[in-house]
């Protein structure tokens, strides 16, 4: 579960390395889970890229350490890190690659463009 002041790794090639959640915009809960969008500030970035340090960005959460329950086969999946990808205001990706696994549940909620950019879909 992601709440405010939580640090997340960035799993795309947009230029940001670490972000910190400052607001959850897709739900009214205190915490966010896989598939929710957040507003974050970039804490660490690589040089000569689009995203710079201390920029305010919109991000989509793709991995959390809290287990995710799958109803169709009664399994729990969990990851070793909290990770997100940077998106534009119209919910398109800023980067061109996604590193690491992406859960299949993101395709069901409207992010079908992740299917072509993700290397591994669980």
Curated annotation (Swiss-Prot):
<dbReference type="GO" id="GO:0009536">
    <property type="term" value="C:plastid"/>
</dbReference>
<protein>
    <recommendedName>
        <fullName>Large ribosomal subunit protein uL14c</fullName>
    </recommendedName>
</protein>
<keyword id="KW-0934">Plastid</keyword>
<comment type="similarity">
    <text>Belongs to the universal ribosomal protein uL14 family.</text>
</comment>
<dbReference type="InterPro" id="IPR036853">
    <property type="entry name" value="Ribosomal_uL14_sf"/>
</dbReference>
<dbReference type="GO" id="GO:0022625">
    <property type="term" value="C:cytosolic large ribosomal subunit"/>
</dbReference>
<dbReference type="Pfam" id="PF00238">
    <property type="entry name" value="Ribosomal_L14"/>
</dbReference>
<keyword id="KW-0694">RNA-binding</keyword>
<dbReference type="GO" id="GO:0070180">
    <property type="term" value="F:large ribosomal subunit rRNA binding"/>
</dbReference>
<comment type="subunit">
    <text>Part of the 50S ribosomal subunit.</text>
</comment>
<dbReference type="GO" id="GO:0006412">
    <property type="term" value="P:translation"/>
</dbReference>
<dbReference type="InterPro" id="IPR005745">
    <property type="entry name" value="Ribosomal_uL14_bac-type"/>
</dbReference>
<dbReference type="InterPro" id="IPR000218">
    <property type="entry name" value="Ribosomal_uL14"/>
</dbReference>
<dbReference type="GO" id="GO:0003735">
    <property type="term" value="F:structural constituent of ribosome"/>
</dbReference>
<keyword id="KW-0699">rRNA-binding</keyword>
<comment type="function">
    <text>Binds to 23S rRNA.</text>
</comment>
<keyword id="KW-0687">Ribonucleoprotein</keyword>
<keyword id="KW-0689">Ribosomal protein</keyword>
